[in-house]
Each structure stands twice: as structure tokens, then as C-alpha cells.
From Swiss-Prot:
Reactions the enzyme catalyzes: 4-CDP-2-C-methyl-D-erythritol + ATP = 4-CDP-2-C-methyl-D-erythritol 2-phosphate + ADP + H(+)
Presence of the UniProt keyword Cell membrane in the record: no
Pathway, per record: Isoprenoid biosynthesis; isopentenyl diphosphate biosynthesis via DXP pathway; isopentenyl diphosphate from 1-deoxy-D-xylulose 5-phosphate: step 3/6
Family: Belongs to the GHMP kinase family. IspE subfamily.
Organism: Clostridium kluyveri (strain ATCC 8527 / DSM 555 / NBRC 12016 / NCIMB 10680 / K1)
Biological processes, Gene Ontology terms: isopentenyl diphosphate biosynthetic process, methylerythritol 4-phosphate pathway; terpenoid biosynthetic process
Source organism phylogeny: Bacteria, Bacillati, Bacillota, Clostridia, Eubacteriales
Physiological role: Catalyzes the phosphorylation of the position 2 hydroxy group of 4-diphosphocytidyl-2C-methyl-D-erythritol.
Active site positions, chain numbering: K8, D133
Domain of life: Bacteria
UniProt name for this protein: 4-diphosphocytidyl-2-C-methyl-D-erythritol kinase
Keywords: ATP-binding, Isoprene biosynthesis, Kinase, Nucleotide-binding, Transferase
């Protein structure tokens, strides 16, 4: 069974508090984009076999796909195994939920194969224990995500909008970014209600002008190159640019494919991982 596991971007990301266990409380708008990994999933007699086209991707228990299979099997008493070939296209450590999306896709397939009667809310609860982005990745589309990310509410679709995405040569540790974040020093928070109204109106310009990610306070300060990338994208005619997740990927919306293509072509000469795609 060949399936797609889509990347996500954050149209907004706000940190509104911190739980006693150290997890940060979030309020964010997530959006699926047409950039995806391919997973070829085959049931086998026993065990978990994972292969990947990228040599730097671990194929053992460090991989969220492995964790997803192991967790599902142990929770529901599945004795047979699974073989998974991953064709990795989503950049890693990029703020695009590549690993979480792969894990979410595998959980959905495991459910369909072994326990199709399993309610989605139970599958989502299982996914939360793997990673905070996994519940959203199971649902996808345009959604308001709250709590640590596990409370997902679908909102009006914001699909088919053009964007250019740049992932610089380095990765970022999500844990380190949150560890460095001082909530008391966040001066301007995203206005989520205004952003949702902009999404409801279908206005790409209004959405672009109201995007905000408070984690930029940490990641852009540590990596000034990201601010340069944002400015470059705007100079090419983007309506707005933002860092996705904890970074370092930067995306920008365009209302004209020609402008986006020119931007893509120029950025591709400077940065290795550049994509031109759409929201889905």
C-alpha cells in the first residue's frame, strides 16, 4: 500500500502558557501543503522493517514510524509485522512535521488493516503519545490546534494558494527552541481570531499580513540568515513570509505564479532545499 504523508506549515503559532510537566500550551493555525513523503507499507509475518532512501534517517526505534507501529501493535495485540519503505522528500528538523506526518500516516493504515472499527478519537489519542503534531497530521487541512497540539479543530479550507518554501542548510531542535523561549518577553502575540476571519474570507493578502510565529523570537535571533531569507522572499513579491514551527524553514505566499517561479529559480541558486508548492 503506497500512501502520501504531507508536510505542514504554521500560519500562526502562539505560546500562551506552560504546564507543570514542562510542555508549552499552544494556540496555532496549521495548514497542509503539497509536499509529501511516500510510504510503501506491506504486512509481513512478524517484526518491524523500515528502509529509507535517505541514509541519515534512522530506521530503528528512533524513527517515529517505528514508534507508531510498535505502539499500535502493543496497544491492540497485533502479532504480525510490517515492512515500510520511506521515500523522504520533506526536509528533516525543519518545522514541517515530516516525522510526525509519517507516523500519522502509518497509524491510519494500521487501523485500516487491522482494526477498521477503531474510532478516530482513540487513534488520535494514541498519536498524541508519539508527538504533539501527530494528531493534526492525522486530520490535515486547515485547523486550529490547541493544548500541546492535541486539540484539533478543522476550520474553513485555505487550499490552492501558491507558496515558496526555503529550508536552509541547518536543522533546528524543537526542544532547544522551546527551552530558550521566555514567554514573559513575548511582546506581540498572533491575533488568531483575525487570522481565522481572514481565512474564512478567502483573502490571501489578509492571511499573509496577519501571520505570526512567536518562536521566531528565538530561532531568528540565533540564526540571522532566516531573517535574510524572509526579506529576500518579500523582495521577490511575496505577500508575507513566516517561519514554520520551530524553524528553520521559511515560507512565503504569492498571488502570482510567475513571481513565485522567478523567486523559486533565484532562491534555488542560493539554497539547496527550495520548493514551490500549494496549500491543500
Amino acid at each position: 500500500m503506497l500512501i502520501k504523508a504531507y508536510a505542514k506549515i504554521n500560519l500562526s503559532l502562539d505560546v500562551i502558557g506552560k504546564r507543570e510537566d514542562g510542555y508549552h500550551l499552544l494556540k496555532m493555525i496549521m495548514q497542509t501543503i503539497d509536499l509529501y513523503d511516500l510510504l510503501n507499507i506491506t504486512p509481513i509475518e512478524k517484526g518491524i522493517e523500515i528502509k529509507c532512501n535517505k541514509s541519515y534517517i534512522p530506521c530503528d526505534k528512533r524513527n517515529l514510524v517505528y514508534k507508531a507501529v510498535e505502539l499500535f501493535a502493543s496497544n491492540y495485540g497485533i502479532k504480525s509485522g510490517v515492512s515500510i519503505d520511506i521515500i523522504k522528500n520533506i526536509p528533516v528538523a525543519a518545522g514541517l512535521a515530516g516525522g510526525s506526518s509519517d507516523a500519522a500516516a502509518v497509524l491510519k493504515v494500521m487501523r485500516d488493516i487491522y482494526i477498521p472499527e477503531l474510532e478516530y478519537k482513540d487513534l488520535i489519542k494514541l498519536g498524541t503519545s508519539i508527538g504533539a503534531d501527530v494528531p493534526y497530521c492525522m486530520i490535515g487541512g486547515t485547523a486550529l490546534c490547541q493544548g500541546i497540539g492535541e486539540k484539533v479543530t478543522s476550520i474553513s479550507s485555505f487550499k490552492n494558494h501558491i507558496l515558496v518554501l526555503v529550508k536552509p542548510f541547518f536543522g533546528v531542535s524543537t526542544a532547544e527552541v522551546y527551552k530558550s523561549l521566555d514567554i514573559s518577553k513575548i511582546k506581540i502575540h498572533p491575533n488568531t481570531d483575525i487570522l481565522i476571519n481572514a481565512i474564512n474570507s478567502g483573502s490571501l493578502l489578509k492571511v499573509s499580513k496577519n501571520m505570526k510565529n512567536v518562536l521566531e523570537n528565538v530561532t531568528l535571533k540565533k540564526h540571522p540568515l532566516l531573517r535574510k531569507i524572509k526579506n529576500e522572499l518579500i523582495d521577490f513579491g511575496a505577500l508575507g513570509a513566516l517561519m514554520s514551527g520551530s524553524g528553520p524553514s521559511i515560507f512565503a505566499f504569492f498571488d502570482d505564479m510567475l513571481k513565485a517561479q522567478i523567486c523559486y529559480d533565484k532562491m534555488k541558486t542560493k539554497y539547496k532545499e527550495v520548493f514551490i508548492t500549494r496549500t491543500v
